[in-house]
Amino acid sequence: KPHRYRPGTVALRSTELLIRKLPFQREIAQDFKTDLRDIQLAR
């Protein structure tokens, strides 16, 4: 018998992961943009 998660648990875990990732990605995107700008200026 395969182990089954309760539907609520999975939804909660995935949303939690999304919430944790989103601000992080936003920061990375901004850092990435500034890095690109610096690289272009340095050329």
Curated annotation (Swiss-Prot):
Q: Name the domain of life.
A: Eukaryota
Compartments in which it is found: Nucleus; Chromosome
Which InterPro entries does this chain map to?
Histone-fold, Histone_H3/CENP-A
Q: Tell me the SUPFAM superfamilies matching this sequence.
A: Histone-fold
Where does it mainly reside?
Answer: nucleus
Give UniProt keywords alphabetically: Chromosome, DNA-binding, Nucleosome core, Nucleus
Gene Ontology terms, MF aspect: DNA binding; protein heterodimerization activity; structural constituent of chromatin
Keyword DNA-binding assigned: yes
Q: Which GO terms describe its cellular component?
A: nucleosome; nucleus
Cytoplasm listed as a keyword: no
Please describe what this protein does. Answer: Core component of nucleosome. Nucleosomes wrap and compact DNA into chromatin, limiting DNA accessibility to the cellular machineries which require DNA as a template. Histones thereby play a central role in transcription regulation, DNA repair, DNA replication and chromosomal stability. DNA accessibility is regulated via a complex set of post-translational modifications of histones, also called histone code, and nucleosome remodeling.
Family assignment from sequence similarity = Belongs to the histone H3 family.
Q: How does it assemble?
A: The nucleosome is a histone octamer containing two molecules each of H2A, H2B, H3 and H4 assembled in one H3-H4 heterotetramer and two H2A-H2B heterodimers. The octamer wraps approximately 147 bp of DNA.
Q: Report the protein name in the record.
A: Histone H3
According to its UniProt entry, this protein's organism is: Penaeus vannamei
